[in-house]
Each structure stands twice: as C-alpha cells, then as structure tokens.
C-alpha cells in the first residue's frame, strides 16, 4: 500500500485523485488549506493565491478569523473524505492560543468525531507561536494515537526548531512529524530524529535530493513519503525515493509502511 502522507486539499478533488493514479499511489493523507495555487493559470493569479499562504506563514493572523477559517477548511476536508473514503485519510488543524480545556474540546469536536488521524499542519510564524504548541502537546496526552504535524521550514527558525525538539522530548507519548525535514536545518533534525523515539521525518519540500538521501540512510524507519501537493508532485517525490534507495523493503516502508504503522491503519 503506497500512501502519500502529506497532501493539501486540491480542487476539484478529482484532479487530486488523477494525480494519485498517475503516480501509482493508493491513498493520501489530506490536510486542510486556505490558498489553492492549483487554480492559478497566470503568474498574477499565482501571486494572489500565495499571498494568502504567506500571511499564514508569517503569523499575520486574527484569532477569531483564524478559527472560522479552520472550521470552513475542516468542512471542505470532511466533504472530500466522505466522498472518497477509499482514497483519503485526514489530519485537522487546531487553533493556537486556546487554553487547555478549549483545545481538548476542539480536538473532540473537529478531530476525534470526524475520525481524523492526526493534528496539523501547524505553521508557526515566530518562536512565540512554537512555544504555544505546548498546549497542543498537553491536550494530546489524552489522545496519544494522534500525531502532530509541524511545518519546520521557513519561517521557522533554528531556535524555533530547538523549542519544538524540547517539547518532543518533554512529551514522549506524542508522536511528532517534522514537516519538510527542517529546511536548511535538516542536519539538526535528522540527528534529533535518530535519537528520539517519538520523532518522524516528512520528506516533502526538501531543497535537495541529498537531504532525502541522508534521511533515508540515517533513519529509514522514520521517513514518511509525501509530496506536499499541490506544491509538489506525488509522482516525482515517489520516483526520487525509488531512485535514491535500492532496498525494496526500505522503499516499501517509506512509501507506506512507516505511516501505516504510525497511524495504526491496519491495512
């Protein structure tokens, strides 16, 4: 079973299924999204869509609007999961800045009740927002089967990554997926994941195939195939793993076995 462990919802959803079929991928784990760059046909349209993403990544957020946006995005995600249950699993967002009880209530209402498999993607725009993740970690103590997926490329700094590492060690029952292998800080993250049982590597959006090669060499049982579609292509990311690794068992684990085990999918 080949599973793309990190894709954002593409519209129309049939386009997403077509890409999976072309790549020879059986299932994908969908994450919510606000921008839809796949809709853009011109550079200006693309810039308009990406401006929304940059605001999210920079931490330019309004708490009330943020929660409403998340609710709408979750509804879009659930609609896709219900329409194609044989093709998709889902992760759902959780707002930062809530207290512990509010966070647990949100997880119950939007994550657990919808049978989502984890929480995220979290895109902290500054170190203070990384620190706010501790409330999420505390809440997940009640749901140890739900991993947390955190964006660790720009604008997350090395200091922010160090804060996330400390949280990962402080809450060993919470599985943490380090999204995009930490960007330019990939060596720090690979070393950390190698020594930390509850830490995992998302292989999407790496800036070099060498990064993926080193991750596979050091922590093959912690590597998760993903494309970050529509920002990456399921086929190309799958081919890169197959090219860089010659061990069939390791390839099969990275392409689906590792994430199946992490999420207890029982496929």
Can you say where each PLM-predicted feature lies in the sequence?
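Active-site neighborhood of phospho(di)ester-bond hydrolases with catalytic His/Asp-centered motifs
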Residues: 2-5, 29-32, 91-92, 120, ...
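A general structural detector for well-ordered alpha-helical segments in enzyme core domains, enriched
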Residues: 16-19, 73-80, 103-110, 132-139, ...
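Catalytic pocket-lining loop regions of alpha/beta-barrel enzymes
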Residues: 117-118, 125-224
């Amino acid at each position: 079973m080949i599973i793309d462990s990190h894709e954002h919802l593409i519209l129309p959803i049939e386009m997403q299924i077509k890409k999976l079929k072309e790549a020879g991928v059986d299932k994908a784990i969908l994450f919510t999204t606000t921008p839809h760059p796949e809709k853009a046909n011109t550079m200006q349209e693309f810039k308009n869509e990406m401006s929304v993403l940059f605001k999210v990544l920079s931490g330019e957020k309004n708490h009330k609007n943020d929660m409403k946006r998340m609710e709408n995005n979750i509804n879009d995600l659930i609609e896709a999961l219900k329409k194609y249950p044989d093709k998709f699993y889902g992760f759902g967002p959780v707002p930062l800045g809530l207290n512990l009880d509010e966070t647990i209530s949100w997880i119950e209402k939007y994550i657990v009740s919808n049978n989502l498999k984890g929480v995220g993607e979290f895109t902290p725009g500054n170190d203070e927002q990384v620190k706010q993740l501790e409330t999420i970690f505390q809440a997940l103590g009640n749901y140890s089967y739900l991993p947390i997926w955190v964006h660790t490329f720009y604008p997350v700094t090395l200091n922010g990554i160090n804060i996330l590492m400390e949280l990962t060690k402080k809450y060993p029952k919470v599985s943490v997926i380090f999204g995009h292998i930490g960007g330019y800080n990939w060596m720090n993250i690979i070393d950390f994941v190698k020594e930390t049982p509850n830490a995992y590597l998302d292989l999407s959006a790496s800036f070099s195939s060498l990064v993926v090669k080193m991750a596979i060499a050091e922590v093959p049982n912690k590597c998760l195939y993903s494309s970050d579609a529509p920002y990456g292509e399921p086929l190309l990311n799958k081919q890169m793993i197959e090219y860089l690794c010659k061990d069939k068992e390791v390839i099969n684990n990275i392409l689906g076995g590792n994430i199946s085990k992490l999420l207890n999918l029982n496929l």
